[in-house]
From Swiss-Prot:
GO terms for cellular component: ribonucleoprotein complex; ribosome. The keyword Ribosomal protein applies. Belongs to the bacterial ribosomal protein bS21 family. This is Small ribosomal subunit protein bS21. The gene is rpsU. Keywords: Ribonucleoprotein, Ribosomal protein. It comes from the Bacteria.
Length: 15
């Protein structure tokens, strides 16, 4: 899972 700057981006990466 790639983690970006922002919770929204993290959430999208998890999905």
């Amino acid at each position: 899972v790639q983690i970006f700057v922002x919770d929204n981006n993290v959430d999208q990466a998890l999905k």
